[in-house]
Swiss-Prot record:
Its EC number is 6.3.2.6. It comes from Shewanella baltica (strain OS155 / ATCC BAA-1091). SUPFAM superfamilies: SAICAR synthase-like. One of its GO terms (molecular function) is ATP binding. The keyword ATP-binding applies. It is an enzyme of class 6 (ligase). Pathway: Purine metabolism; IMP biosynthesis via de novo pathway; 5-amino-1-(5-phospho-D-ribosyl)imidazole-4-carboxamide from 5-amino-1-(5-phospho-D-ribosyl)imidazole-4-carboxylate: step 1/2. GO terms for cellular component: cytoplasm. Pfam families: SAICAR_synt (PF01259). This is Phosphoribosylaminoimidazole-succinocarboxamide synthase. One of its GO terms (biological process) is 'de novo' IMP biosynthetic process.
Length: 367
C-alpha cells in the first residue's frame, strides 16, 4: 500500500448512521448520531452524561491547513502521514493530565480508534482562548510596528522577539464571525479584550459574567500543566489556543468544559529547549510549516494578506509541495507526540477501513 493510501485525507464520507448533515472543518469532521443511537451508547457504554445528551463521532484527518488553506504534496499525498493520530494522542494525554490535576472535563466520552472521538454536544463559547508565554507571532508583529496595547493589555517597552513575557497573557480573539457586538468587527479571528467580553458576555456565549474568570483560570491552569510537562522533556510551551463550551451534567447543572484539541502542534507553538538556550528557534509545531511556505513561494504576501484570499486559495490548490517538506512535518508531529505520551504513534495502513470496522463491530453505527 502506498504512502498516500495511509493518509486519511477525506473524513466526511464514512457510512456512519446520522440524520444530520456531516459538519466538515479544516481537519475534523463531525457526525451527529441519531437520538436512538446516542441513548443506546450512553446506556450500554455507561457514559456519565444525561440520557438525552446528543452524541457525535468526531473523526480527525491527516489534512494540513495553514493560512486558512489546505495544502497537499507530490505523489498524490493529500495530507501528513501520522498527523491525525499524533494530534489526538497529544490531546488525549493532556486531557488525562488535566483530570489528574482536578481541572475541568473535556467533551470526549470515548476513544474507539486513534482517529476517532465520541463526544458530547456542547454549547460553545465564541472566543478563541489564546494564552501567551513568549512574544512572537502576531503579538510580535504588532509590537515591532510600535503598538503597545494588544487585546487591551499594555505591553512594556524594550521587549525583544521571542523573549519570555513578564507574565502569562490572555489575548482572546473571536471564534467565527460575530455580528452586532459594539466595537467588534464582523470578521473571523478579530482580537478582542477582556472588557469587550465583559460588556457583551452573553453574545460571546457565556452564561454568567463570573464564568469569564473561570474560563481564564482554566486556560491558565491548563497552560501551566502542559508547560511543566513539556519542560520535563526540554520543550518550551510558547503559546496556545484553547476552546471552551458548556454541557449539562446528570443533575441538570451547566458546567464549563474544555473542547476541541489542547496543546497540540496545530494549536500551539512549541520550541526546542536546547535550541532556545542557544539563541535559536527550532519549531516543533505547525509554525515550522508556515515558515516553510513563506520561504517556498516567491510572493509571501499572498499568504499574509487577507485581501488576496482568491490568489492564496489558487496557490494551495495548484501547487504540489515537495515530499520531503510533507515528511518533515510528519516527523515533527509524530516526534512531539511520542515525546509527550512516551509511546509510539500508530500509523494504520488503511485507517478508513479500520474505523469502519470498529464502529460497526463495537458500536453498531455503520449503515
Amino acid at each position: 500500500m502506498s504512502l498516500a493510501d495511509s493518509v486519511l485525507a477525506i473524513n466526511n464520507d464514512l457510512p456512519i448512521r446520522t440524520d444530520s448533515p456531516v459538519h466538515s472543518g479544516k481537519v475534523r469532521s463531525v457526525y451527529w448520531l441519531t437520538d436512538a443511537d446516542s441513548r443506546r451508547l450512553i446506556t450500554t457504554k455507561g457514559y456519565n452524561v444525561p440520557e438525552d445528551t446528543p452524541l457525535a463521532i468526531m473523526v480527525i484527518s491527516d489534512r494540513i491547513s495553514a493560512f486558512d488553506c489546505i495544502f497537499h504534496g507530490e505523489g498524490g499525498l493529500k495530507g501528513i502521514p501520522g498527523k491525525g493520530a499524533a494530534l489526538n494522542a497529544i490531546s488525549n494525554h493532556w486531557f488525562k493530565l488535566f483530570a489528574e490535576n482536578g481541572l475541568a472535563d473535556s467533551h470526549i466520552l470515548d476513544i474507539p480508534h486513534p482517529f476517532v472521538w465520541i463526544v458530547q454536544k456542547a454549547r460553545p463559547i465564541k472566543v478563541e482562548a489564546i494564552c501567551r508565554q513568549y512574544i512572537t507571532g502576531s503579538m510580535w508583529r504588532a509590537y515591532s510596528k510600535g503598538e503597545r496595547v494588544f487585546c487591551g493589555i499594555t505591553l512594556p517597552e524594550g521587549l525583544e522577539k521571542a523573549q519570555k513575557l513578564p507574565e502569562l497573557l490572555i489575548t482572546p480573539s473571536t471564534k467565527g464571525i460575530l455580528t452586532g457586538i459594539p466595537g467588534v468587527p464582523a470578521q473571523d479571528d478579530v482580537n478582542i479584550s477582556r472588557s469587550d467580553i465583559e460588556a457583551n458576555y452573553q453574545a460571546f456565549g457565556f452564561e454568567k459574567l463570573s464564568d469569564i474568570d473561570l474560563y481564564e483560570k482554566l486556560l491558565k491552569d491548563g497552560f501551566k500543566v502542559i508547560s511543566k510537562a513539556l519542560a520535563d522533556i526540554d520543550q518550551v510551551f510558547v503559546d496556545t489556543k484553547f476552546e471552551f463550551g458548556y454541557v449539562t451534567d446528570k443533575d441538570g447543572n451547566s458546567k464549563l468544559i474544555y473542547m476541541d484539541e489542547v496543546g497540540t502542534p496545530d494549536s500551539s507553538r512549541i520550541w526546542d529547549g536546547a535550541a532556545y538556550r542557544d539563541g535559536k528557534i527550532l519549531e516543533n509545531s505547525k509554525e515550522g510549516f508556515r515558515q516553510f511556505l513563506l520561504n517556498h513561494f516567491p510572493d509571501p504576501d499572498v499568504l499574509l494578506n487577507k485581501d488576496r484570499m482568491p490568489e492564496r486559495e489558487a496557490l494551495a490548490r495548484d501547487n504540489d509541495l515537495p515530499l520531503e517538506a510533507m515528511m518533515q512535518v510528519s516527523r515533527t508531529y509524530t516526534g512531539v507526540a511520542e515525546k509527550v505520551t512516551g509511546a509510539p504513534i500508530p500509523l494504520p495502513a488503511n485507517p478508513k477501513a479500520d474505523i469502519i470496522k470498529i464502529l460497526k463491530d463495537e458500536y453498531d453505527l455503520i449503515v
